[in-house]
UniProtKB/Swiss-Prot annotation:
Family: Belongs to the HAD-like hydrolase superfamily. MtnX family.
A GO cellular component annotation in the UniProt record: cytoplasm
Protein name, UniProt field: 2-hydroxy-3-keto-5-methylthiopentenyl-1-phosphate phosphatase
Keywords, alphabetical: Amino-acid biosynthesis, Hydrolase, Methionine biosynthesis
Keyword Calcium: no
EC number assigned by the record: 3.1.3.87
Length: 219
């Protein structure tokens, strides 16, 4: 049996959502805001919404985007402690993110290998950014997730494994419905309460480490 922690990135590992920050800074608000609303109220699939958002951004400003996000990204307190706790206790840890490789990987490069990061890809060869989807939905999911967290969980899970998810928003909801234990903050708490999904609230990763150390969450 392996305990597998599948952790969101934007708004979870980082204190703010990097896609929202990037779009707010660089995208035309009259085009971005309806897409944001559609994704959040689930009238627009994540894959469609995120794909359309990035088509609003010119490819030739790639370094500006990277510099902007690296300068403002704040890692939520306790993340290194959680990684160390997972390593010392034989817990498998992976990032499952609806974010994009060109900013997720640089922000995490000193903390995790790329092999432990599941996220969307990017193509800057055209006039605007085209998002690539290496982790699309499997046959068991038809939600057009983009980076399908439930499909990744099914791919990784072996018989007897325990899936723990950590997240903050609508992109974490489908996995929260299937995980053995959920750590939630912000909008994911609202969704869990609306649908009767058990969860443990957190604000920092120290909260999660404390809970893992003191509670039999895997029973």
């Amino acid at each position: 049996m392996t305990i597998r922690i599948l952790c969101d990135f934007d708004g979870t590992v980082t204190e703010h959502d990097n896609i929202i920050a990037l779009m707010t800074e660089f995208a035309p608000p009259e085009a971005f805001e309806p897409l944001k609303k559609g994704v959040l109220d689930q009238s627009l699939s994540i894959q469609s919404g995120v794909g359309q958002m990035f088509r609003l951004l010119p490819s030739d400003r790639k370094q500006d985007y990277i510099d902007f996000l690296e300068q403002r990204a704040v890692i939520r307190p306790g993340f290194k402690t959680l990684l160390a706790f997972a390593k010392s206790n034989g817990i498998d840890f992976a990032i499952v993110s609806g974010g994009i490789d060109f900013f997720v990987q640089p922000i995490l490069q000193e903390l995790l290998t790329d092999e432990a990061i599941y996220c969307n890809g990017s193509d800057f060869s055209g006039e605007t950014i085209r998002i690539e989807w290496p982790h699309t939905c499997d046959a068991a999911c038809n939600n057009q997730c983009g980076c399908c967290k439930t499909s990744i969980a099914r791919k990784l899970k072996q018989d007897g494994d325990i899936i723990v998810t950590i997240g903050d928003s609508v992109t974490d909801f489908e996995l929260a419905k299937q995980a053995d234990h959920v750590y939630a903050r912000d909008y994911l708490i609202t969704l869990c309460e609306q649908h009767g999904i058990a969860y443990t609230p957190f604000e920092t990763f120290y909260d999660i480490v404390d809970h893992l150390q003191t509670t039999e969450v895997y029973a």
